[in-house]
């Protein structure tokens, strides 16, 4: 029995039995795939530590409760479930909620259901939508192990073809923004990514490095936690315009900075102006996922509209089909991101 009042989880059983959570799930649900010896040992350990399978989750395979679960993975690493100046998640969740109601379902927003302290209701939905999963994401591993249907918004970069996913097309977004910056006059473009191990960060970095190699440019690549928000501005300007161990001192300062998050872009713009670097005259600044602050800052900042309302509605449609054990037809296509050119990349034509 575990110490204190901690409720034993499938992970605790797996650790005690020295097997994977997926193996525990197979053993406890008598689904085959493991030897009877292993299954009996797992069941015995589960009894010993007091593990009780989630009755709601196990009942999913027999009946429907008319609920879709939404797991927004970036919120699990941000400083708040309501990050200041960010409307992407609100737009996504609102559209998904209404789309679910339209289909006769309700939407339940949950945090990481694979955590030991997650509530019993976290695995109660008929199907799940998981946004921006991480490499080898434990949420996907758990859902797959429990045979609970799910669809992802963007894919697990370590398992790109393992699960149904609406791909975010990070490669296309990077290509589009780099082309825009060059057309606006940029010659040396730096990229600032986040640190979450998701496909958006990884594929954007890879595409940027590929572009640098193909065009004979020296990469100027920095990464900062998404949770830092606009506070990264001074660090980015220090690294790119002052002596820093992050980049060779011989690297010329960039004339454009592309930040994958809108809050990073806002912080960089503010910090540059505070140092006397004019935006956009001396430095072009652009963001990937736009934030409200990018539309109200001075200057306003060029970003993408990732169309979260459309993505949310499409994901709900797919999740409902999975919940009703209907096949998903054809590849899952996300709507293209729309570049919104604003003052930070628009220079006066004189």
Give the residues covered by each predicted segment.
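Hinge/beta->alpha junction and helix N-cap segments in small-molecule ligand-binding domains
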Residues: 77-79, 83-88, 112-116, 166-176, ...
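Amphipathic helical "hinge" segments at domain boundaries
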Residues: 2, 51-117
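Flexible loop/hinge segments that line or gate small-molecule binding clefts
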Residues: 134-175, 263, 289-301
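Flexible loop/turn connectors
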Residues: 241-350
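Short acidic capping loops at alpha-helix termini that bridge into adjacent secondary structure
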Residues: 187-189, 219-221, 279-284
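Short acidic/polar active-site loop segments enriched in Thr and Asp
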Residues: 20, 66, 126, 187-188, ...
């Amino acid at each position: 029995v575990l110490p204190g009042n901690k409720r034993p989880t499938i992970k605790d059983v797996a650790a005690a039995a020295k097997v994977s959570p997926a193996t525990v799930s197979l053993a406890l649900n008598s689904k085959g795939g493991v030897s009877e010896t292993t299954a009996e040992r797992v069941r015995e350990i589960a009894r010993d530590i007091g593990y009780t399978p989630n009755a709601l989750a196990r009942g999913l395979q027999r009946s429907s409760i008319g609920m879709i679960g939404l797991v927004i993975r970036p919120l699990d690493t941000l400083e708040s479930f309501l990050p200041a100046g960010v409307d992407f998640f609100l737009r996504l969740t609102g559209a998904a909620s209404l789309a679910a109601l339209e289909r006769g379902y309700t939407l339940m927003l949950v945090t990481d259901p694979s955590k030991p302290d997650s509530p019993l209701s976290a695995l109660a939905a008929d199907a799940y939508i998981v946004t921006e999963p991480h490499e080898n994401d434990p949420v996907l591993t758990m859902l797959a192990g429990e045979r609970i249907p799910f669809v992802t918004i963007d894919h697990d970069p370590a398992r790109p073809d393992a699960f149904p996913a609406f791909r975010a097309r990070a490669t296309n977004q990077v290509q589009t923004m780099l082309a825009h910056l060059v057309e606006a006059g940029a010659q040396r473009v730096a990229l600032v990514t986040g640190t979450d191990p998701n496909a958006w960060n990884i594929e954007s970095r890879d595409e940027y490095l590929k572009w640098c190699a193909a065009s004979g440019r020296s990469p100027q690549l920095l990464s900062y936690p998404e949770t830092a928000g606009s506070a990264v501005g001074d660090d980015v300007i220090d690294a790119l315009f002052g002596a820093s161990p992050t980049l060779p001192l011989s690297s010329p300062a960039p004339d454009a900075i592309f930040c994958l998050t809108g809050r990073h872009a806002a912080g960089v713009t503010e910090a540059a102006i505070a140092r006397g670097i004019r935006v956009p005259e001396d430095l072009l600044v652009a963001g990937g996922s736009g934030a409200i602050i990018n539309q109200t800052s001075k200057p306003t900042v060029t970003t993408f509209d990732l169309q979260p309302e459309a993505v949310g509605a499409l994901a709900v449609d797919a999740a409902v089909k999975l919940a009703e054990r209907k096949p998903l037809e054809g590849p899952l296509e996300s709507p293209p991101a729309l570049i919104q050119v604003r003052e930070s990349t628009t220079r006066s034509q004189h």
